[in-house]
């Protein structure tokens, strides 16, 4: 992060703009909207500045830049078409420990100004760090269309209710659940937009007096195979509402960066052949946190119901009477194959797909005879350590040694790596790869050279 986003309180504080043209005028509007006590210095001014000065909204200082104008300032903006003058303003401000923005020269500035979506008191700022103002503007336009104009009224009304809500609800968790109900209540939003005081009061009283469910809950969320862009919208909503997020090592850092900042994070990383935290203990963590009345998200790589032990975890919650729900995720087989250019089914090569775990509970045995049949695709999860055995068993049961195979490491991530070969090479290929990896076996692998679209490291 090159810039720390902050919101400045400038009301009745001295600010300086050097420049009297159109660019300076746009900056002046923002500072005036923020209530700043504004001085503008330039050799000449466009008419808007004169109009503002005549209305007593700002002070004009006509003439060359004088560094003493900065002596009482909190913030300055250099907005002239003279690079040397802008640099001089910046250096003078720096010497006085005053933040200074230099228009169109972010490297010379000590702060930059973002694109703003104004739903006062709710404010959203978008910045590209000065590298691409056009991109920031396009993002702002998209956000403008997503955020209702009356959102500011809802935020302002919430501010008026804070004291009462604090008295009504004893804990932070209860208050947060109330606010979540209020902010998604369409009737209240519409009543505020229409200034319908009777409806506002009725809806508010109903929301405040409606009993809250003090039980916690657990939401099982599939994080997808790695690329944060593959996290579902509902999954994103859940991790941003969670009090506690229990996650494993298959959840990428990019996805964890989307978690609500003040949520507790509990790492229970697991890998094939080694469990950092025993499954029974994970079950108890979920139960314990939910019994405290917290909203718990169990965040799992891929899909929680495909080799994710989601069923085992939910059985514990069900037996204890804890409410739960499930948000599916894109499973590794689907994500890794798509990002590797390998269709799992194809009219000419595969009419079915089998998803198989590479390690079983002690004493488990696969139906190798059926797995060795043609016209299907096999996908082995967590099979890297058993690759040589998989190779041997499939060949023993009749699968041709030249059957195409691929191993996908860190599928869908920028560090994705894919190697392919034949079944007779599977054990050898596996020694070149690291976990997490997925093994794909079938004629469809032969289409990879033609259909691969994602970079291969």
From Swiss-Prot:
The active site is at residues 248, 270. Keywords: Cobalamin biosynthesis, Lyase, Methyltransferase, Multifunctional enzyme, NAD, Oxidoreductase, Phosphoprotein, Porphyrin biosynthesis, S-adenosyl-L-methionine, Transferase. The modification Phosphoserine is found at residue 128. GO terms for biological process: cobalamin biosynthetic process; methylation; siroheme biosynthetic process. Residues 216-457 are annotated as: Uroporphyrinogen-III C-methyltransferase. CDD domains: SUMT. Residues 1-204 are annotated as: Precorrin-2 dehydrogenase /sirohydrochlorin ferrochelatase. NAD(+) binds at residues 22-23, 43-44. Its EC number is 2.1.1.107, 1.3.1.76, 4.99.1.4. GO terms for molecular function: NAD binding; precorrin-2 dehydrogenase activity; sirohydrochlorin ferrochelatase activity; uroporphyrin-III C-methyltransferase activity. SUPFAM superfamilies: NAD(P)-binding Rossmann-fold domains, Siroheme synthase middle domains-like, Tetrapyrrole methylase. InterPro entries: 4pyrrol_Mease, 4pyrrol_Methylase_sf, 4pyrrole_Mease_sub1, 4pyrrole_Mease_sub2, CobA/CysG_C, NAD(P)-bd_dom_sf, Siro_Cobalamin_biosynth, Sirohaem_synt_dimer_dom_sf. In the N-terminal section; belongs to the precorrin-2 dehydrogenase / sirohydrochlorin ferrochelatase family. PANTHER family: SIROHEME SYNTHASE, SIROHEME SYNTHASE-RELATED. This is Siroheme synthase. The lineage of its organism: Bacteria, Pseudomonadati, Pseudomonadota, Gammaproteobacteria, Enterobacterales. The gene is cysG.
């Amino acid at each position: 992060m090159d810039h720390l986003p902050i919101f400045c309180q400038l009301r009745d504080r001295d600010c300086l703009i050097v420049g009297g043209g159109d660019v300076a005028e746009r900056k002046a509007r923002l500072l005036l909207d923020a209530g700043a006590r504004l001085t503008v210095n330039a050799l000449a001014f466009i008419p808007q500045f004169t109009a503002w000065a005549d209305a007593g909204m700002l002070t004009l200082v006509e003439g060359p830049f004088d560094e003493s104008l900065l002596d009482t300032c909190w913030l300055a903006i250099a907005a002239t078409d003279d690079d040397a003058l802008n640099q001089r303003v910046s250096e003078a401000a720096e010497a006085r420990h005053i933040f200074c923005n230099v228009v169109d020269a972010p490297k010379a500035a000590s702060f930059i100004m973002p694109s703003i979506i104004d739903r006062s008191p709710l404010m959203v700022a978008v910045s590209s760090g000065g590298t691409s103002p056009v991109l920031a503007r396009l993002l702002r336009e998209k956000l403008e269309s997503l955020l209702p104009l009356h959102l500011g009224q809802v935020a302002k009304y919430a501010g008026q209710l804070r004291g009462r809500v604090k008295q009504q609800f004893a804990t932070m968790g209860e208050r947060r659940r109330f606010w979540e109900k209020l902010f998604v209540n369409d009737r209240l939003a519409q009543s505020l937009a229409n200034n319908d005081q009777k409806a506002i009061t009725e809806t508010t009283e109903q929301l405040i007096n409606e009993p809250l469910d003090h039980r916690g809950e657990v939401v099982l969320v599939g994080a997808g195979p790695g690329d944060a862009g593959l996290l579902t919208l509902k999954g994103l909503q859940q991790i941003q509402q969670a009090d506690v997020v229990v996650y494993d090592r298959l959840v990428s850092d990019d996805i964890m960066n989307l978690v609500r900042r003040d949520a507790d994070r509990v790492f229970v990383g697991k890998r094939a052949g080694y469990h950092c935290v025993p499954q029974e203990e994970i079950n108890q963590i979920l139960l314990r946190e939910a019994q405290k009345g917290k909203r718990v998200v169990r965040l799992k790589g891929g899909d929680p119901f495909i080799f994710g032990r989601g069923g085992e975890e939910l059985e514990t919650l069900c037996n204890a009477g804890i409410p739960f729900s499930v948000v599916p995720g894109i499973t590794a087989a689907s994500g890794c194959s798509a990002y590797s250019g390998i269709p799992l089914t194809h009219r000419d090569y595969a009419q079915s797909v089998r998803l198989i775990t590479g390690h079983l509970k002690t004493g488990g045995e696969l139906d190798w005879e059926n797995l060795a049949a043609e016209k299907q695709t096999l996908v082995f999860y967590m099979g890297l350590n058993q690759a040589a055995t998989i190779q041997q068993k499939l060949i023993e049961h009749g699968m041709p040694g030249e059957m195409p195979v691929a191993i996908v490491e860190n599928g869908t991530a920028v560090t994705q790596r894919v190697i392919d070969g034949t079944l007779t090479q599977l054990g050898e290929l596996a020694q070149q790869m690291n976990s997490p990896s997925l093994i794909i076996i079938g004629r469809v692998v032969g289409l990879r050279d033609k259909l691969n679209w994602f970079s291969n490291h």
